Amino acid sequence: MFPIDFCHIPVSIIKRSAGRSAVAAAAYRSGTKLTNEWDGMIHDYTRKGGIVHAEIMLPAHAPPEFADRSILWNSVEQIEKARDRQLAREIEAALPRELSGEQQLALVRAYAVSYTHLRAHETRSN
């Protein structure tokens, strides 16, 4: 394995009270155009460069239609109706340059599975 001299992984919460939108964040991170059905705003980041990979990973029990980014994040926006709701968590990570693109992707996927599994257990008080 490669030595990692520095690990920086900030986690932030996307919440309406801070003027943020899960749909807007998803559009920005994926470099796509999405319309937020909650407030009617169109978020177009199709000209944004630097998107190496965008993927939605769903648990086995999730409805298959949530593989569509617009359906997934608009569903979150619709379910969480109050202005003070936390809509999503955003995790940024500096990946080791020594790893290939495939290795970086595998690392991120493993982290996502591990993180969501841990969060599910915290939520259920297990």
Regions found by a protein language model. Give the residues of each.
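N-terminal nicking endonuclease/strand-transfer module with a His-rich metal-binding environment
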Residues: 1-125
